[in-house]
Amino acid sequence: MTVKEKKIIDQYVPIVVESTGRYERAYDIFSRLLKDRIVFLGSPIDDYVANLVIAQLLFLEAEDPDKDVYLYINSPGGSVTAGLAIYDTMQYIKCDVSTICVGQAASMAAVLLAAGAKGKRYALPNARIMIHQPLGGAEGPAKDVEIITRELLRIKDLLNRILSKHTGQPIEKIEKDTDRDFFMSAEEAKEYGIVDKVVSTRE
């Protein structure tokens, strides 16, 4: 995300004012949600976005390691390395991370959705989930192309194994399904093992 894009987004972030007795306090909407242990991933995943999500996860663990964190996801995916940084942090912290898909979770975002705590992964009824193999390309000397191709294959295998671990699907099925864009409805994602429940209202 460029500085210019961030400034444009910041212009549209609502400010919430809370009154407590004689005092008023203003928060941007995401800071207010953080008070309720809600982290919102609502953009393509890059290093900037990943660092923000990771910082929030670490902060909430420090606040209370025994309480769940709620990660809402509406993202088309993005950088694999940035996404894996979020994934590793989700597994690293002591808190259970409940994942909730609103809108879409595609590519790396689908991996994060599946990586939530077992029994605490949700999708709203009209959410769309998509898995596929990592995208990449190479040009230049043949040796460089070979090196990049080898790394892409390593990352592809890594992501497939992560999906297999969290969905319970055999690695062979994951490899076949991620060979091309594989779209799922919320119910299909539940059957696949990416989410545990489709929810339409708060319980």
Curated annotation (Swiss-Prot):
Keyword Repeat: no
Domain of life: Bacteria
Class of this enzyme: hydrolase
Catalytic activity, EC: 3.4.21.92
Pfam families cross-referenced by the UniProt entry: CLP_protease
Catalytic reaction equation(s): Hydrolysis of proteins to small peptides in the presence of ATP and magnesium. alpha-casein is the usual test substrate. In the absence of ATP, only oligopeptides shorter than five residues are hydrolyzed (such as succinyl-Leu-Tyr-|-NHMec, and Leu-Tyr-Leu-|-Tyr-Trp, in which cleavage of the -Tyr-|-Leu- and -Tyr-|-Trp bonds also occurs)
Biological process per Gene Ontology, one example term: protein quality control for misfolded or incompletely synthesized proteins
Keywords: Cytoplasm, Hydrolase, Protease, Serine protease
Record's subunit section: Fourteen ClpP subunits assemble into 2 heptameric rings which stack back to back to give a disk-like structure with a central cavity, resembling the structure of eukaryotic proteasomes.
UniProt similarity note: Belongs to the peptidase S14 family.
Reported function: Cleaves peptides in various proteins in a process that requires ATP hydrolysis. Has a chymotrypsin-like activity. Plays a major role in the degradation of misfolded proteins.
Protein name: ATP-dependent Clp protease proteolytic subunit
Organism (species): Thermotoga maritima (strain ATCC 43589 / DSM 3109 / JCM 10099 / NBRC 100826 / MSB8)
Organism phylogeny: Bacteria, Thermotogati, Thermotogota, Thermotogae, Thermotogales
